[in-house]
Amino acid sequence: MNKILEKYLYIVPEAYYEYNGKQYMQSVHGKSYIRYNKAKEQAGYATVDVDMVIKYIKEFLNEIGISTIENPIFNPQKLDYSRIKAEFDLEDERDLVWIKFTKDGYVGVVATSNDVNFDIPQSSHEYDRKHNVYNPYSKEYEETWLHNSSGILVHKLGKEWNMDFVLIFPLKNIPKGYKRADIEEAVGNLLIEKRVPILDYYSHLY
């Protein structure tokens, strides 16, 4: 057991709700407002400098035994996941934690995997729109939301993504018994404890 990592593996209050005895993730769709209200609350706090966010995460990753990148600032237009995998000797090119920011300096989301994006709706009419996407694992088309939660929340707040950079932390040597989703959860909770505002506040828990 990694005691330092375990300290940050917990579910933030209100991340889930219960209905008919079952637990569900909070939504950004329909008449669900928990995540939007939380985003609005977070947007009322002062931003934290990118350099400080980097410092917090690098210190934490080193403490749990993950030696990561010296400078995690990447140009999103030039991302090559296979190259990152080879350079940092990752077991899987999805072994990444990444963070994107809004133009006014807020952390938009803490995420994992090889899917950095700056998705955002063009209008509120698109919030609840769905489309069919091919799943290469099931080899079937699946109906899914057109836009992701962080994009919807950022659009609702009247903000825009900063597409000039993204933070990417390659996760080499993930502690035994844990997976990249655990590191994502821990990093999100760490930043919350450090009072770093996160607009898509619950996303790292899903």
Residue positions per predicted region:
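Boundary/linker segments flanking structured domains
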Residues: 1-97, 101-106, 115-206
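Short linear recognition/processing motifs and adjacent strand/loop elements at protein termini
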Residues: 110-112
